[in-house]
């Protein structure tokens, strides 16, 4: 009887652990996760290209002033956000939410400014004497400002309390797929090997 109770308890504990692991794993297929990440990175690349080409797309200014935040994101923050909102998602089903996140993360503002400046010109009077005058002219400036915030800030603004809780679980576990977006290592233990060190 004791053996049956022990087996039953172990079985329930295994089910509980299995539920906890599956509840903290990204519910989407790996290929979809990677494809959606690539789509978001492409949006960021397009934004960078737009900024890089401002002087071509908006010609005619005397000066361009840039105040730019960084462009970039943590792929696991994006996957955690989308998983919390959409649960299992595909490349197609995630597009509207990708746009929503992108619009909340990045704000590009172009503002025209006109300064009246003065230049010194030399003129000659009717008697042949030279004199200088300050002549006003318009100096055109295009202010280019990009503000950005991390997806973690976007998440706290846009998610419901329940979604935010799921987002935080996915962030802590990296969806149980820490290497899906490349880089890093699953080994978090201290390294003691001095192999190759002379």
Residue ranges and their predicted role:
Residues 1-197:
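Membrane-proximal envelope biogenesis segments
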């Amino acid at each position: 009887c004791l053996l049956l109770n022990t087996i039953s308890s172990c079985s329930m504990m295994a089910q509980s652990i299995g539920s906890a692991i599956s509840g903290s794993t990204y519910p989407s297929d790996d290929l979809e996760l990677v494809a959606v990440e690539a789509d978001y990175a492409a949006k960021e690349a397009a934004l960078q290209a737009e900024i890089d080409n401002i002087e071509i797309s908006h010609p005619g200014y005397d000066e361009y002033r840039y105040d730019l935040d960084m462009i970039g994101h943590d792929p696991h923050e994006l996957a955690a956000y989308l998983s919390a909102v959409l649960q299992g998602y595909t490349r197609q089903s995630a597009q509207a939410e990708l746009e929503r996140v992108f619009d909340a993360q990045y704000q590009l503002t172009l503002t025209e400014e006109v300064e009246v400046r003065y230049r010194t010109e030399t003129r000659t009077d009717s008697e042949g004497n030279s004199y200088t005058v300050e002549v006003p002219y318009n100096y055109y400036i295009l202010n280019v400002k990009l503000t950005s915030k991390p997806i973690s800030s976007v998440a706290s603004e846009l998610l419901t309390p329940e979604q935010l809780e799921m987002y935080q679980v996915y962030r802590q576990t990296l969806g149980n797929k820490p290497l899906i977006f490349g880089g890093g290592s699953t080994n978090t233990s201290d390294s003691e090997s001095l192999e190759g060190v002379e």
